[in-house]
Amino acid sequence: MRLLFAGTPDVAVPTLTALVADPRHEVAAVLTRPDAAVGRHRTPRPCPVAKAAEELGIPAIKATSVKSGEGHDAITSLDADVAVVVAYGGLIPADLLAVPRHGWINLHFSLLPRWRGAAPIQRAIMAGDEETGACVFQLVESLDAGPVYRTMTVPIGPMTTAGELLDELAHTATPLVIEALEDIEAGVEPTPQSVEGVTIAPQIHPDDVRVTVTAAAQEIDNLVRGVSPTPGAWAELDGKRFKILRTRCLEAGDGVPSTVATAQPGQLVATRKQLFLGTGSQPLELLQVQAFGKRAMSGADWARGADIDAGTRLR
């Protein structure tokens, strides 16, 4: 089939590459975001999908919006059978949804209807979900509410971060798109989503990623993993922010000094090789932290430089 591919970040590139490699399909064009100005000299830099499209010899439609103008016209004149979306990051207006013969399909990284929205992986980990996955569904006007063609489920490990899980799904979920296109060619109808169990996964706001030291250790650990590596959970010590990048919840049988076991919420306790944070439930080990503008380092190394003592508390 003749395809339009819409995507922007690294996570979308494996699907684009797989579609180009499939002789049954022709990727006629890529829809992506305009080049971003980066660095001191504000040099334009293409996004990962635009760069991949250039390397693959595929024309790119770079548009801030496709509600009207050249981007809109380019899509309507493409004569596509299907448009495939993976992390495009822009809205598709209602009039364009019907332009491809078989509409638009989207690879979404959650088990719909759970976690509709822009940050499904992050929100799943932050909520403490034990599993998530990916699905391919038909785009409709309502947010991530269209019927589903294909679904896969993956466990969320106790140490898994959002970045690691997203990278995994970017590759393992790609076959779902190929299978969904096979379904479309075969005339298979997608399955409507359940009206029950709908949750929303809004973009991560800076206030969402501040560590609340009175929260339970598991809740803080979920937050840290859910927003790692970016934007990163943060806390404040002596008026200065620092990121907490890796944590570990203590397990039964972990031997810790009494000063660690009795740490109060917000209290930092450093041993020779470890750093712990008192929480609303039990101590949490801080495995990796990063002062703003500095490199990431182990919690113990950071504690030595920060001169942590028995009275040190986070705000």
UniProtKB/Swiss-Prot annotation:
GO molecular function, one term: methionyl-tRNA formyltransferase activity
InterPro entries assigned: Fmt, Formyl_trans_C, Formyl_transf_N, Formyl_transf_N_sf, Formyl_transferase-like_C_sf, Met-tRNA-FMT_C, Met-tRNA-FMT_N
EC number from the UniProt entry: 2.1.2.9
GO CC annotation: cytosol
Record keyword Transferase present: yes
Database matches in Pfam families: Formyl_trans_C (PF02911), Formyl_trans_N (PF00551)
Enzyme class, broadest EC rank: transferase
UniProtKB keywords: Protein biosynthesis, Transferase
Residues involved in (6S)-5,6,7,8-tetrahydrofolate binding: S110, L111, L112, P113
The keyword Cell membrane belongs to this UniProt entry's keyword annotation: no
Reactions performed catalytically: L-methionyl-tRNA(fMet) + (6R)-10-formyltetrahydrofolate = N-formyl-L-methionyl-tRNA(fMet) + (6S)-5,6,7,8-tetrahydrofolate + H(+)
NCBIfam families: fmt
Family of the protein in this entry: Belongs to the Fmt family.
Role played: Attaches a formyl group to the free amino group of methionyl-tRNA(fMet). The formyl group appears to play a dual role in the initiator identity of N-formylmethionyl-tRNA by promoting its recognition by IF2 and preventing the misappropriation of this tRNA by the elongation apparatus.
Protein name, per record: Methionyl-tRNA formyltransferase
Organism per entry: Cutibacterium acnes (strain DSM 16379 / KPA171202) (Propionibacterium acnes)
